Design a protein with these regions (language model features):
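Short Cys/His-rich micro-motifs in 6-15 aa windows
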Residues: 31-44
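Metallo-beta-lactamase
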Residues: 5-26, 34-37, 83-84, 132, ...
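Active-site HxH/HxHxD metal-binding segment of metal-dependent hydrolases
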Residues: 89-152, 236
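Active-site- or DNA-interface-adjacent structural scaffold in DNA-acting proteins
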Residues: 24-29, 137
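Conserved beta-strand hairpin/beta-sheet module of binuclear metal-dependent hydrolase folds
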Residues: 47-92, 167-182
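Short, solvent-exposed secondary-structure boundary motifs
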Residues: 58-70, 130-131, 146, 158-160
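Short, flexible loop segments at the rims of nucleotide/cofactor-binding pockets, characterized by
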Residues: 61-66, 82-88, 101-104, 153-159, ...
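Active-site-proximal loop/helix segment associated with metal-binding centers of metalloenzymes
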Residues: 65-72, 128-130, 134-139, 184-194
Length: 239
């Protein structure tokens, strides 16, 4: 087993999409799958590509094709000033249009952000509380997100809960909630992987923030849904 750090080696877990930079562990540090299901980054890029699906004129949903395990959707947001990715695809696809900034909801889905950062000279940012986790250490972050901020029309809100640095975003009438909540058999549940009480408390914070917002669409980790339908499920969850 090669465990020696080497920045030229990168492996992708085909079960969860996690990228391992410079090391080849026996098991995936994110999902625990054995290294028999790993691909080199080059192999991954030859077998998978990243497809963009329009959400609206400013937002594009990014997914690996064919589906790369548990990989979550990333979203490209085009503002008047810059382009942003919210989270990052696991597959490194050089054919994608350049992006100025990669900002994360949390550290579970850093994808191939190190490679896109190098290819596009993108600035990569995450909440500092999630940058210190063990699985984040091989990734490069150019700066840390402030707790709450507004930048080029993108509103960011630090919630904690699912992870210490979890941050959700709103751009115009689109809510980017990632995997804070799951839709399972037409019902909504909180993400079960994290502190239960803090995640529930974060749900109340989210509700306080979004209640007076003019939201039409919700972009989740594997779905895009109209806000009224999503909010009805969310209200049942938090009440």
């Amino acid at each position: 087993m090669n465990t020696k750090a080497n920045p030229d080696n990168q492996y992708v877990c085909t079960i969860c999409g996690f990228n391992m930079i410079g090391y080849y562990p026996e098991y995936c540090p994110f999902c625990g799958a054995p290294n028999t299901v790993f691909l080199t980054s080059e192999e991954c890029s030859s077998r998978y590509s990243v497809k963009g699906t329009p959400v609206n004129k400013n937002v594009l949903r990014l997914n690996s094709v064919p589906k790369l395990g548990l990989e979550h959707s990333a979203y490209r947001v085009t503002t008047a000033e810059k382009t942003y990715w919210i989270d990052c695809p696991s597959c490194f696809d050089k054919s994608l249009a350049p992006v100025d900034e990669i900002i994360f909801t949390h550290h579970h889905f850093l994808g191939a952000s190190n490679q896109y950062r190098q290819l596009f000279s993108s600035k990569v940012r995450i909440n500092k509380l999630d940058s210190v986790h063990k699985i984040s250490q091989a990734f490069t972050f150019d700066d840390f997100l402030k707790d709450n901020f507004i930048e080029n029309g993108i509103e960011a809100f630090h919630i904690d809960g699912h992870t210490p640095g979890f941050t959700f975003y709103i751009f115009k009438d689109v809510l980017f909630i990632c995997d804070y909540v799951h839709i399972y058999r037409e019902k909504m549940i909180f993400n079960p992987f994290g502190p239960k009480d803090k995640t529930a408390a974060g749900g109340q914070k989210i509700n306080e923030i979004i209640t007076n917002k003019d939201i039409k669409t919700v972009c989740g980790f594997k779905y895009v849904q109209g806000y009224p339908e999503w909010k009805e499920k969310f209200d049942l969850l938090i009440n």
